[in-house]
Amino acid sequence: WQEDETPHAIQRFTTVDEMCRYELPAWRSTLWGKKVEWYHAMKEFVENMEVRLNGERIPVKVTLSINGDSPFMSAVELAGVNFYSWLLEAPDACREFLQRIADRYVEVETEYRRISGRPMRDGLNYSDDSAQVISLKQYREFCVPIARRLYDMFGCDRFDGRMMHLCGRNVHLHPALLHDLNITLLHGFGSANAPEEMHLLAGKVVLQGNIDPMTLYQ
């Protein structure tokens, strides 16, 4: 985190050995910790805010959740593109590292829900944005066990209870999303996935796409 720059991840290690020895920082010193500060500040701010739609006052709700993240995304941010080759070269080490990040994810999200008073099983907005480039087999091996654990802990059966954000081309992962993770909503995917390719999820999952960036460009 830099006060004068856009928040971004910095690669922390370049070898499998460094990954195995890497100690995750105390989360309250990270961006996840800052979210707690911002949550309390925003709660105070909205007390004096009035928003109206067609003259009718509407509530402004401040939420606190990890949202739109996953252990796989964090691993890629920490290791860089090396992590993709390590999935083949050192799969056990990768699984162990992902599990450590998942444990931290559970710790933080549980605390967030305690602070905000949100029920534990009130839905989860999950994202595996770094995983579109791996195969269905790899996704089932490395991502599904962790995502299933988190969905089962924080998700619910509501239409938005097991949300997945997966931009980029993700059609090859649809069998795992539907049959292994039982997602209820896929959102934020774009034109890399043609409408006729969404047949496996159509009618079973809420599909919420996005504007084709080329449309905006033109």
Predicted feature residues:
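Active-site loop segments of alpha/beta catalytic cores
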Residues: D4, P25-Q218
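A contiguous, low-structure linker/loop signature
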Residues: W1-Y22
